[in-house]
Amino acid sequence: MSKEYMNDGSLSEKWKYRFNFYDQHGFPGFWGATPEYKAAFKALKVRQRLTIQMNFIAFFCSWIYLFVLGLWKKAIIVLLLGILSLFVGALIGVNILGIAVAAYVAVNTNKWFYEKEVKGLNTWSL
């Protein structure tokens, strides 16, 4: 895997750190993380773990932040999912569904941006 992103001036050091970690250890898939990823993740300090694992801006700004990152396909899907969760939550009286969507976006934004910038993938799938 080429590390052209290391010379990209538009990426912050935080993004370069995340991308380098993903290049070396991969990232967890749907069914969980590899043993190599788990060992490398446990070796990190708490602040570094949070940097790798979650994107706080994405938690609070979800679809808007995805648009800013250029992940417009995912932003549209997240916006529609947020609207759907609002209606479903109102129907069944559970207002936490929007928070669940925001948490899902926060945990996956780093992976999605890595796929877009390094691997060149920008799909509609979440």
Swiss-Prot record:
Q: Which domain of life is it from?
A: Bacteria
One GO cellular component term noted in the UniProt record for this chain: plasma membrane
Name of protein: Uncharacterized protein YigF
The organism is: Escherichia coli (strain K12)
